[in-house]
Regions:
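Short catalytic/metal-binding and nucleic-acid-binding patches
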Residues: 1-177
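Glycine-biased, small-residue-rich flexible motifs in mid-sequence functional cores and linkers
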Residues: 168-340
Length: 340
């Protein structure tokens, strides 16, 4: 670990498929998952002040192998690591060009972990899939990833304490529309509701004025519904969340596909995670059929026609598969949910 600020490479055109790319200086987040997601590496617990992972002998072997890896590869620095019950993370910095690629180094590390596990009497496969690599190339990614790795145990503990809040529901029906959802569904039953919708052309003064109105209503008990599409909507929704007020967000995609490997382990990221764990968030992603609903189509057409007339333009229908249609439809669904 290090306290020194490190700037990740910013060349977004760099391709990690180029020969020798994985030997060059870079910063990589690596995730290695235990076979069948078994809790082979430890048990989640709480010491009264924070969530911790009580490591098994195999879990400690993973730590010991990290030290061995650093001895063999002095070009590498571990910026963050976390052993979880069924997986472990490392954020690795390659400080100078190596004779071997970082993939080869990680493969050797995993082989060392397997050997240690066998020495401890564990003869079954330790891993059943290759590690997941994420190269950090954008400014700000490094800090966010280190914080993510550090908070892994706390997030897992919160999910365990509130499992229903992190359970994905594929068929949540509201107002005759079907949604995929996650979070506090009781927010749908709260009678006092407000819609947060702002034009993309709204200036800072308009955003601040609307922010005041939304916060007053939220303080008085209103649940805020929003698609959080425009910058104004995003800013106000973020402030509502930071103040601890409940929020219902309509998503234009975001949940993993039904039946996909990611479905079982999906969880909202970043600040959404904390809001979800405290019962202050509900995420709603409309099913494809919801966008084709006749009442939604009619509402979208009326809204777009009204906006065109305000600009003294003629109105023409837009394709339902376009992002413009979907964005307006999300706001109309939000309006329908608020006004029901």
């Amino acid at each position: 670990m290090t306290d020194k600020t490190i700037d990740p490479p910013l060349n977004e055109t760099f391709t990690w498929l180029q020969p020798g790319a994985w030997r060059n200086p870079c910063i990589v987040h690596v995730t290695m998952v235990a076979s069948l997601r078994q809790a082979l590496f430890g048990q989640l617990a709480h010491n009264g002040s924070e969530a911790i992972v009580e490591k098994t002998p195999i879990g400690w072997a993973l730590i010991n192998q990290e030290r061995r890896m650093l001895e063999l590869c002095p070009e590498i620095k571990i910026l963050a690591d976390k052993v979880m019950p069924d997986h472990h993370h490392m954020v690795l910095q390659v400080q100078r060009t190596m004779p071997r690629s970082i993939r080869e180094v990680v493969r050797g590390y995993m082989q060392g972990c397997k050997s240690e596990a066998r020495r401890l009497g564990f003869t079954a496969p330790l891993y059943d899939a290759p590690p997941f690599y994420r190269v950090l190339t954008h400014k700000g990614q490094l800090h966010a990833m280190i914080e993510y790795v550090k908070a892994n145990a706390e997030r897992a503990w919160q999910r365990r304490q509130n499992p229903e809040l992190f359970r994905m529901h594929r068929k949540t029906g509201v107002c005759g529309l079907q949604f995929t959802s996650m979070g506090n569904h009781f927010l749908l039953d709260w009678p006092d509701r407000q819609l947060l919708e702002m034009s993309r052309s709204s200036g800072e003064a308009q955003i601040q004025e609307r922010l005041k109105e939304v916060l007053v209503a939220a303080h008085n008990g209103a649940v805020t519904y929003t698609a959080a599409i425009s910058k104004g909507e995003q800013k106000i929704a973020r402030t509502v969340r930071e103040h601890g007020f409940p929020l219902v967000v309509l998503l234009n995609g975001g949940f993993p596909a039904e039946g996909s490997p990611q479905e079982r382990f999906y969880k909202p990221g970043g600040t959404y995670f904390e809001a979800c764990s405290k019962g202050r968030l509900l995420l709603l992603e409309p099913a494809g059929q919801a966008f084709l609903d006749t009442s939604i189509q009619k509402a979208v057409a009326e809204t777009l026609r009204r906006k065109a007339e305000a600009r003294h333009c003629s109105y023409t229908d837009i394709p339902m598969e376009s992002q413009r249609y979907r964005f307006v439809a999300l706001n109309e669904m939000g309006r329908m949910l608020v006004e029901r």
